[in-house]
Amino acid sequence: MARPDLHERISSLRKLRVAQERVRVRRQVGRRDGVRLEIDGRWLTGFCSNDYLGLSQQFEVVAALQDAAARDGAGATASHLICGHHTAHETLEREIAEWLGYPSALLFGSGFIANLAVQQALLSEEDDVCVQDRLNHASLLDATRLAGCRLRRYPHLDVEGAMRQLKGAPEGAAMLATDGVFSMDGDVAPLRALSLVARMQQALFYVDDAHGVGVLGPQGRGCVADAGLGVAEVPLQLVTLGKALGGYGAVVVGEEALVRHLAETARPYIYTTALPPAQVAATLAAVRLARRDDWRRARLVELIGAFRDGARKHGFELMASDTPIQPLLCGEEATVMAMSAALEHAGFMVGAIRPPTVPEGKARLRVTLSALHTQQQVQALIEAIVQARDVVSRQPLRASA
């Protein structure tokens, strides 16, 4: 039997994506100024980034990066367990753990790497199982597959479904894993109920709060704190540094024994160069601002309310989200692509989310809000969406990249 040719396979898959009009294209950003982006020589108002608190270009954050780069250079030069673990890394781990009320923390290069590290290190036997919400982030789902343990999924937000899946896999060690805020819907997991399920089934409860920390809860401590939970109920939690904190990387906070086990055994941690100290210094400055500046969260609450009120007024179908992620359901791919193009023509950058990222028939505009947006910009966006809907409804639709 002839071995399959990889180039032929890739070519066939590419042709299929073209036929389905699902080719993905990177847009090149020339410059950025707050929520404004220069793309193809035009300045657009962006409602598509994860810079929820507006910290990525904040003066103190940028100054911290510049000062640390001048002192420590561009990179860590080694993994954490060789000579890449700088004072900046240690300080950031300590302050994030203290902020979130956890005894220990461990830095990773990204949330994807962190989720893989957690599951590979903790679910190491083939009978082990990870039970997950069906709409969890791809990094959580892929991590289970790569770890080699069993994956069981329950319907979105279905606490009884989580219980059934755990009861149906009693043989090995178990983890119950969920997003805190779901990145495509913007809704929040029922953490208190899920924590009880995990306790009853002797499963480790793990929360990926990439989109919650910095935005929700007291002092921006995220979904876990907002639900009145802590390390006793959620022994392990993921925090990404590239969303509300405006930087790059991730931190896993948790029980000391669990975090120590990750540091000593997790291959994605052991065999990866540490984050650049300058980037870590910038994130440390962002953490301190996120803890201090409650006005940023208050501004977000106002903007979220204004957007939802305006969208409802014009008859748009909203999802159950009180977070900065505000999806507008459009249904078909062709519709959402045409809407996104019309908004760009009007001066706004809004992400068009389509299958396979979301289910068939659930394509949507994913509006994301930042504390740097103004009420005027939000109202202008709503007016532009209304106009785009009117234009799109009058023309034949064809999906495009």
Curated annotation (Swiss-Prot):
Q: What are the required cofactors?
A: pyridoxal 5'-phosphate
Pfam families linked to this entry: Aminotran_1_2
Q: Which UniProt keywords apply?
A: Biotin biosynthesis, Pyridoxal phosphate, Transferase
Q: Does the keyword Transferase apply?
A: yes
What superkingdom heads the lineage?
Bacteria
Positions contributing to substrate binding: R24, H137, T357
Annotated positions binding pyridoxal 5'-phosphate: G111, F112, S183, H211, T240
Q: Could you tell me which PANTHER family the record lists for this protein?
A: 8-AMINO-7-OXONONANOATE SYNTHASE, CLASS II AMINOTRANSFERASE/8-AMINO-7-OXONONANOATE SYNTHASE
What name does UniProt use for this protein? 8-amino-7-oxononanoate synthase
Q: Which gene encodes it?
A: bioF
